[in-house]
Amino acid sequence: MTSIEELRVLPPLAVGRLGAAVEPMDNYTAETDPDQPLAPRRLRPAPTFRVDRTSGAITGVETPGELRFTDGQGKVRPVAPFLEVWALTDDHVLRPLTLDLLRLNGLTPGDVRWRVRVGNHKIQRRTYDDRDRIDADTEWFSDHAAHALNGLCPNFLEGRSLPLGHARYLQPTPGFPGVRLRFTPAGGHVYGSAYTDRPTDPDPNVVDFLYDATKGTWRGHADQAGDPRLTIPAQIYAGDDGPNGSWVSRGYLDDECDGLVHVKLEVSGRELTAFGRIGAGPPAYAPDSVPIRTVADELDQALSGPRATAGDTLEQARAVAEEVLRRATETVRLMNTEVMNGNTVDGRVDAASTMVRQDTADTGRLFEPIMAPSLVDTAAVLALHQNVLAALRSGTAPWFADVLRDHDEVGDLTAKGRRKMPALMRGADGRSLALTRRQVDLVRLAARQAIFRQDTDDPEVPR
Amino acid sequence: MPELFEDQAPAVAALSVAGSLGAEEKRPVLPPEFNWRDYTVMLLHVAAEIEHSLMVQYLFAAYSMGGPQVPEARRDDVRRWQEVVLGIAKEEMGHLVTVQNLLTALGAPVNLDREDYPWGSDFYPFPFTLRPFSATSLAAYVVAESPETWSGPKADEIKRVAFESTGQYVNRVGALYSRVDAILKDEEFLPDESFHAGTLPYQASWDEWGRGYTRGERGQDSGNVPDVKSPELLVFGVFSRDSARRALHEIGEQGEAPDADLEDETSHFNRFLGIYEELTAWPEGDQALVSRPVAQNPVTEHRLDESEVAALGVAEVTTSPITDPVTALWGHLFNLRYRMLLTDISHAFRLAGPVDNGGVLTGRGALVHRAFAEMYNLRALAGRLVDLPLERDAPDGPRAGPPFEMPYSLELPHHDHDRWLLQRDLVQASRLLTDQLLSTDPSCGGDPYLVALRESDQRALEQVEHILSRKGCTR
């Protein structure tokens, strides 16, 4: 039997990326070059759905000959993820929801109903004014038109809304019979705040004025020192120096968002529902690099717990250790380590927003570089990471578990604590970044185990 | 044993100078051909070689530990011990660079040399021997690091085992340091102006060399293995008589804890002793399985396989030639990277670090990082060598192990430009070896480590070429 019992939206979390080009970004993979294992990952074009703009149907699958991240006119191509509906049928199999499966249950694509709700609450997070919340809601729909995600906000200028992209229920066809929704993020623009009781100077940074700076407080807002509700660190918005060391907001808005994709289907008198999460972030300007701690790592930890489990093989643990090092190498490649370390730059002390500034501001401690200033020449640090990665590929046990920062060491401001890895980087709480507990534990597992191996050992034996 | 203290007139050659710790109230006597400053420098040269050779022997022992033959129930212990021995070796590296700092502060050249076979000088604890980890080799380390006050039945027993395993009474490392201290503390021997504070920017600092290991924070868990404390890397800058004495005192204490309670777990002596007691409590059958079947003193040169009798009537030192052709290539690669490590350290001492917050950087930081990278390479290569056959056509015979052979010279060219030429030579030599390994042996074709090493050498070559092409590189 193939009676539909439950629904799922897969992937459960999809991250889009902003871009103003009309055509979304093609699919690609990032692979390690076996002949140059220390080099950045190579991007390889991958099979990509082509969607007919008129009908909303997938017309084919193409693997592009080359990858282009812009449309050639200076506009970035957005990453527009597909969300698929899967069904758990009465034989306990999770399978894609298709035209056939719908038909077997006496349903058509028109019976599938969608609703997308996204928001951008960045202003409200800082002003604590609920009228600064920006929300968009498509309401329920079953058609295949593009549904604009228009962000509405009580403190906007009359009749204005923030474009947050659009969602489209793709029309299933015999060739591509799956039930899918595509989320296309917004263009990646900066919007401004205008006064209604006085003239507003033009601003070359903004494409339009949306926010009513007379009605709301966002333009001219300054975080109040000592307020326990502040973001950590505070003052992370576009602004200018104000009186008494304050940081005064210019009233800018971006068009990022995140929210929920709901799907609903009535089967044999029962209403089945499911939802997935979507978000839109800035474009990937280093698409051949992976951050050292990703959402995927968080999900892995949520799924498997903070420790290595009995099911984790030594080989997996070693792979995690190597991946951590690879990402660290990719990250160093993108950093100006001399500046990030708090070295004097062209005679300037405190030349940028760094963990050194953070440590100094939070504790009143002396502005003190993190690593020995002689050690942070960017080329030398990059070479060091590449060398560690090379040595790790020999199969020797990772030896650097010692210097990984534990989750409960993020506030350790001793020299040893500040120098732990990942170094020079900030976590979400304004203190030094740490890997997930599970990442650290897997590296330690590999560190403990690897000396008993022999090259002939079967690598995939669970512990 | 003749002594160069005033109550015993000097009767023998200069190097026969082992004093005892209890001799603090005695005044050292100057041997012929020296003044006090030069004599101090000579003793520090010996100290550097001792620290260097202990470090290498401990590393060899640590690398030999483990292997598939270790019983499952024993693995946690073996991995823990290995971490302890590696930690002690790392601390010896700290001692080694601190001795270089002392030499630098006195205006003397650094010394990264190491006596190869044969072995002789009565300050050296025991004949230099690369041996797989075992209860008998461990006994020698316990005695070498022991405080003068260590006695009793247990001490006698371990000293007996050490004697049998080395063929001589094992000298205590501490004896040399107390001799140096007896000179340092006396203004008549070395006036204050002998200590050049201006050399500090050239000296190794903990901030550069400590790599996140503890500094004076005992008792932090190491992250690699549960219940093993992080090593405590001591790197002291020397800028005065007091700082010189403190550096030596701390090094001595970390070795043998002369002033500490014998139960103090922080000294090398107590850590080695603890492992010795745990290991000897095992059944003998299990004891024999703690290490891989690694040969003693593996060498890449095709010497005749015969015993060389070392000086001073010590035990015979037997070298084990690596005759398997592929293993020999790995051994040569190991020796070359060892040479690169010593060159990087030595080169780093020739360049000043920034005296402020690094507004202008020299190549020093890059050299320090390269030195650490070579340590990681040595670890990786040793991991290969303890798994590769020593002898041609004996695939199931003894394993090779890392040879740690000294280069023909450690001298650096006078001009910085020419030092970078040497660096380039070494990288190119490594490329030749890796290419040879990758192309000639099917078992190495596509070896992920060799492929990565080749690439990192290529990148290093580009960096060296960049330095050589810069106008800032002086001739």
Regions found by a protein language model. Give the residues of each.
Chain B
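Non-heme di-metal
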Residues: 1-475
